[in-house]
């Protein structure tokens, strides 16, 4: 069974009239004798005269009897020829205001398809006349303005692909009828395109430019199959009839947040990009061989994008805004959108705030677009990229917020004078961490707005770990004990270089091994003391009085003997000897000749630098105590190789 062709909403083709006859078109094809042709051959003058006489003799009750006297004609053809062309009561003159008003009322009552029923209420008019009068003159959706270059480009591209299928081309131009498009092409565009090269250079842009016709459509028209229970808000024109109400919305800026449900095209999406609009037009193409493939793709897109569209709707109670341009694509369902740099941050974890989409009246849709999958079309790659970026960004904010906003005692630090850190502090005041907003109202910090972490719903961060930050505790304790610290000038770097040279030279000396071998029992005591307090010994080694005054030129190490004389300390019996209280022999092991100068003369150390480098700050001492307690928890044991 052949499918019935779909027509444009502005099409002038009559759906109920299968045979179109023309008035006195006697120059057409003539039927061959000897055969009964039932095709759409043109009527001759002789056939028209004979039909008039037969109607005068037999009347208009039985058209089969009349058709029996006309070879090659059926009863339907005879009836249509009489009613549409030859009937003397047929009015072919101009339309009056009363007739136009009557047509408008009947269209609102019966809809823009039942033209035969409408014609019965207008004496002397047939359905074809009423249909053409409505679409060409009375329909408020039909544009009567001049043709734009954009519309010409759409017609040119569509005509290259579809040919003279004006009803299909009319679907790409809302507000233009197929008859108007055909007349514009034949009278103006074809000559300009073929002779003057009009639109030839811009043809490379392709058909996606035709999709702008949907975005610039200034009207919406709808016909509800079932009358609603109450009046719908936002209708520009109230229905005059009760059987088939008609709603007209004049301009898109006057449309409220919720569009009335009985609309002709239910596109149940937040935002339709241009490629999606082009896919809608290709979907309605009967001759498109890839139509079924695209339908399946659209159904898959529905499943993958339904949750994302819900997630893009911003929460109405969200007061915190952030300066992130990457989130500007978030679209609010009620057409309320903030400007520029302050796009609302969508909550990805709560979907119960999302507004459900209005129900779809499938009766208003074409037969192939009744399913919701064909009504929701989005750009797949953009949606998937946005979902991935939003999830990664939310995870990053979760880690940053949990690190900066938590501490062991939840104390409020004085950030006007921050403690000494390894990172230089800016000269002006700024918020280093995100302030708490649990029990106090939100305060706008204009000067620190760029540096603040964006606010996020606490419900997302409930499962995040809340580990105390020892470094923040150390800074707070240091401020309480010593007061706010100030930035000190940088310590000269040559002292550090000298220390590194001395340490390198001392590490290369092998005389210490021989001295340790001669020292005997005191070595075990020194090793034990170094194990118990390594930080204190290191501090005493670098910061003791041996580095000051007259002892600066004293060499601490002696030249080493050969490596063959060095015993193995791990296997030697020296570890088993009792500890001696004598200290003198141990210091002798570090004596070196005095004729060997240092790399450079040492200078007096800065107290602050000495504290930081020798482990005397509060946080370093605290870490040392923790390490000592940790090591003391394990019993001592003999090292076995």
Swiss-Prot record:
Gene3D superfamilies, per the entry: Homeodomain-like
Record-annotated DNA-binding residue ranges: 63-86, 115-138, 166-189
Any one cellular-component term (Gene Ontology): nucleoplasm
Segments of this protein annotated with the region Negative regulatory domain: 328-465
All copies of domain HTH myb-type, residue ranges: 35-86, 87-142, 143-193
Cellular compartments annotated: Nucleus
Chain residue ranges for the region called Disordered: 317-338
Region (Transcriptional activation domain): 275-327
Source organism, top-level taxon: Eukaryota
Region (Leucine-zipper): 376-397
One GO term of the biological process aspect: regulation of gene expression
GO terms for MF: DNA-binding transcription factor activity, RNA polymerase II-specific; RNA polymerase II cis-regulatory region sequence-specific DNA binding
Keywords, ordered alphabetically: Activator, DNA-binding, Nucleus, Proto-oncogene, Repeat, Transcription, Transcription regulation
Pfam families: Cmyb_C (PF09316), LMSTEN (PF07988), Myb_DNA-binding (PF00249)
Domain notes from UniProt: Comprised of 3 domains; an N-terminal DNA-binding domain, a centrally located transcriptional activation domain and a C-terminal domain involved in transcriptional repression.
Function field: Transcriptional activator; DNA-binding protein that specifically recognize the sequence 5'-YAAC[GT]G-3'. Plays an important role in the control of proliferation and differentiation of hematopoietic progenitor cells.
Name of protein: Transcriptional activator Myb
Species assigned in the record: Gallus gallus (Chicken)
């Amino acid at each position: 069974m052949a499918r019935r062709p779909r027509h444009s909403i502005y099409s002038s083709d009559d759906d109920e009239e299968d045979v179109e006859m023309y008035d006195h078109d006697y120059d057409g094809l003539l039927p061959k004798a000897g055969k009964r042709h039932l095709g759409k051959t043109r009527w001759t003058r002789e056939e028209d005269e004979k039909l008039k006489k037969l109607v005068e003799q037999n009347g208009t009750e039985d058209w089969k009897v009349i058709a029996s006297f006309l070879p090659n004609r059926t009863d339907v053809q005879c009836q249509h020829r009489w009613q549409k062309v030859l009937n003397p009561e047929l009015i072919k003159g101009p339309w009056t205001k009363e007739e136009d008003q009557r047509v408008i009322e009947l269209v609102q009552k019966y809809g823009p398809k039942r033209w035969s029923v409408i014609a019965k209420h207008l004496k002397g008019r047939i359905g074809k006349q009423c249909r053409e009068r409505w679409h060409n003159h009375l329909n408020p959706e039909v544009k009567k303005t001049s043709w734009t270059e954009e519309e010409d480009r759409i017609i040119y591209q569509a005509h290259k692909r579809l040919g003279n299928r004006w009803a299909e081309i009319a679907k790409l131009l809302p507000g233009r009828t197929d008859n108007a498009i055909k007349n514009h092409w034949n009278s103006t565009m074809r000559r300009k395109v073929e002779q003057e090269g009009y639109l030839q250079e811009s043809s490379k842009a392709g058909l996606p430019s035709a999709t702008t016709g949907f975005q610039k459509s200034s009207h919406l028209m709808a016909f509800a199959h079932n009358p609603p229970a109450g009046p719908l808000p936002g209708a520009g024109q109230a229905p005059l009839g009760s059987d088939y109400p008609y709603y007209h919305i004049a301009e898109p800026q006057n449309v409220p947040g919720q569009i009335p449900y009985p609309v002709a095209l239910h596109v149940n999406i937040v935002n339709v990009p241009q490629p999606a609009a082009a896919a809608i037009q290709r979907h309605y193409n009967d001759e498109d061989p890839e139509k079924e493939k695209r339908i399946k793709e659209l159904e898959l897109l529905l499943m993958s994008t339904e949750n994302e569209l819900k997630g893009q709707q911003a929460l109405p109670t969200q007061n915190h805004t952030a300066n992130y341009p990457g989130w500007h694509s978030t679209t609010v369902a009620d057409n309320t959108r903030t400007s520029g740099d302050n796009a609302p941050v969508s909550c990805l974890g709560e979907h119960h705030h999302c507004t459900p989409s209005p129900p779809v009246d499938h009766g208003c849709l074409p037969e192939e677009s009744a399913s919701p999958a064909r009504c929701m079309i989005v750009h797949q790659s953009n949606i998937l990229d946005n979902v991935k970026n939003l999830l990664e960004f939310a995870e990053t904010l979760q880690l940053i917020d949990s690190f900066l906003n938590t501490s062991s005692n939840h104390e409020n630090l004085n950030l006007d004078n921050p403690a000494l850190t390894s990172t230089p502090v800016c000269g002006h005041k700024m918020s280093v961490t995100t302030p708490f907003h649990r029990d106090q109202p939100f305060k706008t910090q204009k000067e620190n707005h760029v540096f603040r972490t964006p606010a996020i719903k606490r419900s997302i961060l409930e499962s995040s770990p809340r580990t105390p930050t020892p470094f923040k505790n150390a800074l707070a304790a240091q401020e309480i004990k010593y007061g706010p610290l100030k930035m000190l000038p940088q310590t000269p770097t040559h002292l550090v270089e000298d220390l590194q040279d001395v340490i390198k030279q001392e590490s290369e000396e092998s005389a210490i091994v021989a001295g340790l071998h001669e020292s005997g029992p005191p070595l075990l005591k020194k090793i034990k003391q170094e194990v118990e307090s390594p930080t204190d010994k290191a501090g005493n080694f670098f910061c003791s009085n041996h580095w000051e005054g007259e002892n600066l030129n004293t060499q601490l190490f002696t030249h080493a003997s050969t490596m063959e004389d060095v015993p193995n300390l791990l296997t030697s019996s020296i570890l088993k000897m009792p500890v001696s209280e004598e200290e003198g022999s141990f210091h002798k092991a570090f004596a070196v000749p005095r004729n060997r100068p240092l790399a450079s003369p040492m200078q007096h150390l800065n107290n602050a630098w000495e504290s930081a480098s020798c482990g005397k700050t509060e946080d370093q001492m605290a870490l040392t105590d923790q390490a000592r307690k940790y090591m003391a928890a394990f019993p001592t044991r003999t090292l076995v190789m």
